[in-house]
From Swiss-Prot, chain A:
Organism: Cyprinus carpio
Listed InterPro entries: ATP_synth_F0_asu, ATP_synth_F0_asu_AS, ATP_synth_F0_asu_bact/mt, F0_ATP_A_sf
SUPFAM superfamilies, per database record: F1F0 ATP synthase subunit A
Protein name: ATP synthase F(0) complex subunit a
PANTHER family: ATP SYNTHASE SUBUNIT A (PTHR11410:SF0)
Membrane topology: Multi-pass membrane protein
Similarity field: Belongs to the ATPase A chain family.
Biological process terms in GO annotation: proton motive force-driven ATP synthesis; proton transmembrane transport
Gene: mt-atp6
Length: 227, 251
């Protein structure tokens, strides 16, 4: 029995054992390891095709040094997409609604790109702080602004994912409650609200996939600047 | 993608560092995955399901006892039981579930077949590529067989070529022999002609010499008196002839 709408975002635990570990480990179960066969079944074929295609696309703008991140970024993408999509099912807990998890992904990875940039090519990395073609009087202000923009990136990454998913889930709950409450009273309005709920669910499916993709894409962009 | 390698016999032997060659050599064959080759083929299609989630085996299981409607009665009964006993309470999540269920079912129904054909096409392309390689190899080998047969047929006709060549050579030899024979004949004839001409020349010279000698001796032997007598005789003969001619002419 829910007391408030925010209880769905409470990190679940059972008899003191946190269930979030199970929730985080679940996506791994859903992707079978491809067997050592030449022709596989449809699931494995599609899975392999998708991962190959995605990694190829992601690694296109990166130079060879950035290709070391292929495994990390591809697995991160699969992980986030699966978690987001599974969270849309009823009575599930979405780990990516937890700010702690998202910051735990964003800060170390962003920091890694910055440190790589500063270590290997400090001039170029610092040069990104000043966009080309700025008028001379604006340079000091712009440096400060770009530095702030750089430092706010991990925060933006984590909070973007958290906020999108949390907001989406909350909206779904609210509108579903509206349908539930209106159904005995005003069925027509309830049906209209149900239509809104359907559209919202469609949106949430899209958002789930897009947010995961954006997270990984931005990380690859930061990597591209620095590697 | 990370593959998990499962070696049978993953014991203390394998717990050494990677540098120890002994680790790999001590892997037992009859327990490792190599003994399972050839791998049995995968089933062509996945397990049959009814209504997308319930496996067909459930219906087959219940059919002997409860007939065709058995599983449906079970499902309905379970659902009503959970609802009536409030084991499952209808709340706002139900509508969220209905909504996401509608999205999923719509997605599967609409894009399912196309995704399946896409996956099949990927596999079929793989198989087709390999098949093409195999077909090309077979075609080239068959072509090789055909070419070899043709060469063997060509070899059979070789004796005709040899006969023709033999004839040619024989003709050349014959011609050469005849030419040389002709030449020899000519040479011998020339020699013999020379000898004949030489003899003729001798004879002619002897004859001329003799004639000259006779003439010389006759001329020498003619005395001047005989010469006068012969001239006078000739003149008298001429006169007689003239007379007879005149006489014949006047007659």
């Amino acid at each position: 029995m829910m007391v408030s709408f925010f209880d769905q975002f409470a990190s679940p635990s059972y008899l003191g054992i946190p269930n979030i570990a199970v929730a985080i480990a679940l996506p791994w179960v859903l992707y079978p390891t491809p067997p050592a066969r030449w022709i596989n079944n449809r699931l494995i074929t599609i899975q392999g095709w998708f991962i190959n295609r995605f990694t190829n696309q992601l690694m296109l703008p990166l130079n060879v040094g950035g290709h070391k991140w292929a495994l990390l970024l591809a697995s991160l993408m699969i992980f986030l997409i699966t978690i987001n999509m599974l969270g849309l099912l009823p009575y599930t807990f979405t780990p990516t609604t937890q700010l702690s998890l998202n910051m735990g992904f964003a800060v170390p990875l962003w920091l890694a790109t910055v440190i790589i940039g500063m270590r290997n090519q400090p001039t170029i990395a610092l040069g990104h702080l000043l966009p080309e073609g700025t008028p001379i009087p604006l340079i000091p202000v712009l440096i400060i602004i770009e530095t702030i923009s750089l430092l706010i990136r991990p925060l933006a990454l984590g909070v973007r994912l958290t906020a999108n998913l949390t907001a989406g889930h909350l909206l779904i709950q609210l509108i579903a409650t509206a349908v539930f409450v209106l159904l005995p009273m005003m069925p027509t309005v309830a049906i209209l609200t149900a239509a809104v709920l359907f559209l919202l669910t469609l949106l949430e499916v899209a958002v789930a996939m897009i947010q995961a993709y954006v997270f990984v894409l931005l990380l690859s962009l930061y990597l591209q600047e620095n590697v | 993608m990370i593959r998990k390698y499962t070696y049978g016999g993953h014991t203390l032997k394998n717990s050494g560092s990677f540098g120890a060659c002994l680790v790999q050599a001590s892997r037992s064959f009859h327990q490792s995955s190599q003994s399972l080759a050839p791998v049995p083929p995968l089933p062509e299609k996945g397990g049959k399901v009814r209504h997308g989630i319930f496996p067909e085996e459930l219906f087959t299981l219940l059919y002997p006892k409860t007939g065709v409607t058995g599983p449906y009665m079970l499902g309905t009964g379970l659902l009503l039981y959970m609802l009536s006993k409030e084991i499952y309470v209808i709340n706002h999540e139900t509508f969220a579930a209905a909504s996401i269920g509608a999205v999923v079912i719509y997605g599967v129904k609409k894009f399912g077949p196309s995704v399946a054909t896409f996956a099949d096409k990927i596999n079929e392309d793989k198989v087709a590529k390999a098949q093409e390689v195999k077909d090309q190899a077979m075609a080239s080998l068959a072509q090789g067989i055909e070419d070899e047969k043709k060469e063997q047929w060509r070899v059979e006709g070789r004796h005709m070529l040899f006969d023709a060549k033999r004839n040619n050579v024989a003709m050349l030899l014959e011609t050469n022999y005849r030419e040389r024979l002709h030449m020899v004949t000519n040479e011998v004839k020339k020699r013999l002609d020379y000898q004949v001409e030489l003899q003729n020349l001798h004879r002619r010279m002897e004859q001329e010499h003799m004639v000259n000698w006779v003439e010389q001796s006759v001329i020498k032997s003619i005395t001047p008196q005989q010469e006068k007598e012969s001239i006078a005789k000739c003149i008298s003969d001429l006169k007689v002839l003239a007379k007879t001619t005149q006489a014949r002419a006047s007659v």
